[in-house]
Amino acid sequence: MKHRSGEIGVKNIVGAKVYNIRKKRGIKQKDLLAQLQVLGMDISATSLSRLEGQYRLVQDFEVVFLAKALSITTRELLDE
């Protein structure tokens, strides 16, 4: 797996939180991706990677799916 190098993007505020929570819990990106797809979120591995790297915008419904997949509240993803 490729590790992040250089600066992160600035297109969303939840991406870094998703990445940090996932890493802290030892969840592989492919496992989070599978969980999101089981919940009904249509997202590719590339799109999830860009979301975590803050290189793409996040839709409001995606925040809901991400929170459910990580078993946290949407507020936890949105609070700074």
Protein language model regions, located:
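A short, Lys/Arg-rich alpha-helix, primarily the initiator
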Residues: M1-R25
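Short, contiguous strand/loop micro-motifs
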Residues: S5-G6, S49-L51
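Residue-level signal for the short linker/turn that defines the boundary of a DNA-recognition helix
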Residues: I13-A16, I27, D31, I43, ...
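Short alpha-helical DNA-recognition segment
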Residues: G26-R50
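DNA major-groove recognition helix of helix-turn-helix/homeodomain DNA-binding modules
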Residues: Y55, Q59-E76
